[in-house]
Amino acid sequence: MTDEGPSKGGYRRVLLKLGGEMFGGGSVGIDPDVVGTVARQIAEVVADGVEVAIVIGGGNFFRGAELQQRGMERARGDYMAMLGTVMNCLALQDFLEREHGIDTRVMTAITMGQVAEPYIPRRAARHMEKGRVVIFGAGTGMPYFSTDTTAAQRALEIGCEVVLMAKGVDGVYTADPKTTPSATLFETITHREVLERGLKVADATAFSLCMDNQMPILVFNLLTEGNIARAVGGEKIGTLVSTPASGVA
C-alpha cells in the first residue's frame, strides 16, 4: 500500500467512514434529510464507476464508553452500540436503493441473517467489483474496538486505496476549532504526527493500524455538499494523513 495521495483521476476503491452522530443531525435517532443527502453524494461517485465500501458508527443511538460512565458494563454497552450501527446501515441502504437504484449489501460482523450478510472479505470485494455498495455494520463484532478501527481494518482487508473519514469539520486542526478559534488546518500530516500531537481525529488504534500499513486517511467535511465526490476525485480538500513509503514519518 502506498499513500502519497490519489493517482491521476482519483481513487477507484474507497472506504468511507461516517460518524453515527451525523446521521442523527445532532439528536438521538436518524435524520432522513441527512441520510438522504449522504446517499445522494454516494450515488454520484458510484455512477462514475468508483467502488465504495462504508463503515457507519452508532453514536446517534449509543456509545459504549458513555454508557460505562453511567455504570453499565463496557462490553454490554459496546454490543448495544453495534446494534445501533446496523440500524444506520439499513437506513442508508434503503435510501441508496429506493431513491437512487444503487445495488447495496449490508454485511455485519455479528450474524443477523434476516437483515444482512455475514462479513466475508472476499465476498465483500466481489460485491464491489460488481458495482455494489457494501455497508459494514456491527463494528468488528468485538467490544472495546471503535468503528474508526473497523474502518481501518476493513479498508486494508478488502484492498481499498484510502479511508475517507467524513467529519463535521474541514479536516485536522492544531486544536479543536470549535473551542479554539485560532486553530489552523493541516493540509497534510503524517500518522505519527497525529499520534504524537494527540490530535483527536480518530482513535489511536485506527491511526496506528493505518500507519503500520501505509493506508492514507483523508479527513474532510461531510456537511459541504459535493465533498464526497471531491475527495474521491483527488481534489485538495480537508487533510491528507499519510506515511512515506519508507516508513519514516
UniProtKB/Swiss-Prot annotation:
Catalysed conversion reaction: UMP + ATP = UDP + ADP
Family per record: Belongs to the UMP kinase family.
SUPFAM superfamilies: Carbamate kinase-like
Binding site for UMP: G58, D78, T140, G141, M142, P143, Y144, F145, S146, T147
Organism annotation: Saccharopolyspora erythraea (strain ATCC 11635 / DSM 40517 / JCM 4748 / NBRC 13426 / NCIMB 8594 / NRRL 2338)
Quaternary structure annotation from Swiss-Prot or TrEMBL: Homohexamer.
Listed EC numbers: 2.7.4.22
Keyword Cytoplasm: yes
Subcellular location as annotated: Cytoplasm
Gene designation per UniProt: pyrH
Binding site for ATP: K17, L18, G19, G20, G59, R63, Y173, D176
Protein name according to UniProt: Uridylate kinase
Pfam families xrefs: AA_kinase
GO biological process: 'de novo' CTP biosynthetic process; UDP biosynthetic process
InterPro entries: AceGlu_kinase-like_sf (IPR036393), Asp/Glu/Uridylate_kinase (IPR001048), Uridylate_kinase (IPR011817), Uridylate_kinase_bac (IPR015963)
